[in-house]
Amino acid sequence: MIKTLIIIIVSVIVGYLISHFNILNFVISSLIEVTVINNKKVIVGAIVGQALIYFFVFFLPLSSVANQIVKEESSTNYRVNPPKTPSLVGNLYLQQQLQQQQQQQQQLQQQQQQQQQSHHQPILNTATPFTLQNHLIPNPSIKTTQYNIK
């Protein structure tokens, strides 16, 4: 990324300096010295040379940088094409999801075991002799003196 920024900055500065000084000097010299430069080959050669300098100094480095940026952006487009090898953050997220699923499965198994145990245990009569249902019937499991109330 830093290399890309350096290439862009240097290309812009060099391209600006070339365009500013060479074009202005060429235009001024061609306007002032039209009578001196009568050879059309020199003018065409200067324009072609200027175009080649622009191409090699300004356009070519910036186009390669632009292509690199496009490739990086297309390879990091996670919404459309998720990476085949998840990143460290992705691994941590997947581990957390797996742990949550395991905890949910353990809780579900514990609930199922508790339900099975509650279904297999016999129902014990835990009513005391003074409840509304059994106030006239003594409870045989309690070994105390009980009185029947009428």
Curated annotation (Swiss-Prot):
Keyword Transmembrane among record annotations: yes
Keyword Iron-sulfur: no
Bilayer-crossing regions: 4-24, 42-62
Gene Ontology terms: cellular component: membrane
Keywords (A to Z) from UniProt: Membrane, Transmembrane, Transmembrane helix
Subcellular location: Membrane
Membrane topology: Multi-pass membrane protein
UniProt protein name: Putative transmembrane protein DDB_G0277665
